Every structure is written in structure tokens, then in C-alpha cells.
Amino acid sequence: MPSSTRPRVVILGAGFGGLNAAKALAKDADVTVVDRHNFQTFLPLLYQVSTAGLAADHVVHPVRGALRGTGIKFRMGSPISVDHKNKSVKLDSSEVLEFDHLVVALGSSTADFGVPGVTEHGLGMKSVHEALMIRAEVMRRFEDLARFEDDTRLSIAVVGGGPTGVEMAGALAELKRGPLKNDLAHAANHMDIYLIEAGPRILPMFSEKLSARAESDLHKLGVFVKTNTAVREIQSRKIILKEGEPIPAEVTVWAAGV
């Protein structure tokens, strides 16, 4: 197809969806990808960054590297307006990109389901920055715990029993059983890890057999799995439930709605 007659496609977002769409369309169209960052974050491995299993640069990859040799153009910036009549999108750099087709692949943000305190007291799992915040907070709390030689305990709660929450709870348990216990066994033995799920089972999108196996494995790792446990409010050092006693939580990781 001659270049002059190839449709112009602008894709907003350089995540998995945006980049895959760009590569699929590049053969028959002139494609431009727009993202506010010039790197892509491999979200499924953020839990490893949160628990010191991986360095941050292991889950971040340059967008231009992913597009090298494809003929796809890249612009770093954020869209501030779309003119549907004239088929153009304006970026915060003041650049205007014209298109025949516009693909919006901007991803999603964490849903708090209207639960009070999530923003103030919960730590999300959507970016490297958030993953590093979780790591720093867990380690800070562990160092605080290390000062005590009595029965003072540290509780870390993960809210959300989907894949992200299950992986996070398991990784925290491995961190506790491995590096932290090797550094200071007394403190590690006084850490409690909770996985809280509002529904009747964790990993509800998978088979009941797989859910049961995952819950069993978490129990073996020392994770307290709480199903049928709906959260009413997140406070600074505890989680208020819709029913039952509050759950202590010096650190709350919000993996619900991720």
C-alpha cells in the first residue's frame, strides 16, 4: 500500500495493549504511539520489586527499544484534548497529531470501591514508585520491630484475593521466611501476614481446585487467609471490617481492583 494512502493511527498508551495493537497495525498503517513515559512497566512482576526479589530496573523497559525496527513512531507526552471533528489530538507539548483512527489504550487506575482510607493509608500496586514505597515501608516497619525483644508484632495486610494479591502475600511470606529471618529471626517470627478477600474464595476467576490449592500453599507459608471478609475502612494501623473484629495492619497493600 503506498505510504500516501496508508491510514494514520494514533495510539494513546504504551502498555501491553497499546504496544501489541501498534505492532499488529504497523504493517498496514502509519502508527504513532503516545505515552507520558518513555518506558513500559511489566506490571505482573511489581510484587517482586515490592518484596526485594527484583531491582526496579528489571521490570522497566524503554518503549523505543520495544518499537525498534517496526517503523512505529513514538511521542512522549500526555493528551490534553481530542478534536473528533478534525481528527487530531493535542499533547501537553503543544504538538498536534492528526489521525484517521484513534486507539485509546491508557490502562486503568486502582479502584477503591468507595472504601474510606484507601488513598490515605493503603499502598497501591500500579507502578514502580508504588512498589518501592511498599518495599521501603515494609523494611522500615521491620527495623522498628527489631528494636523490641518482647512480644510486639508487625502485621502486614494485603487486601484483594486476585492474582496480584495472592502473589504479593506469598512473596511477603517468602521474604519473612528467608532474608528477614536470616537477618533477625526474632523479629521475623513476630510478623503476621494477612490476605483479605471479600468473596468466598481467593482467585475466583480460576477453578475451585486451583483456588483451594493456592489457599493451602499460602497457609503453609504462614499467611492468614481471610475469605468472606469485606473491608469497611482502612485506618492508619488497622483494617475495619463490615463484620467481625478489626485486623491489625501497620502496612496495608491495596490489591483489590488492580
Q: What spans do the regions from the language model cover?
A:
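FAD-binding core/adjacent interface of flavoenzyme oxidoreductases
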Residues: 1-6, 71-157, 186, 253
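Well-ordered beta-strand scaffold positions
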Residues: 87, 94-95, 230, 237, ...
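Predominantly flavin-linked oxidoreductase catalytic cores and closely associated redox partners
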Residues: 120-217, 221, 225-227
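Beta1-alpha1 glycine-rich phosphate/pyrophosphate-binding loop at the start
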Residues: 2-75, 80, 166-206, 253
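Short hydrophobic core segments
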Residues: 10-12, 97-108, 231, 239, ...
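A conserved beta-strand/loop element that lines the FAD pocket in flavoprotein oxidoreductases
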Residues: 68-83, 219-234
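Short glycine-rich anion-binding loops that position phosphate/pyrophosphate groups of nucleotides
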Residues: 17, 107-110, 169, 258
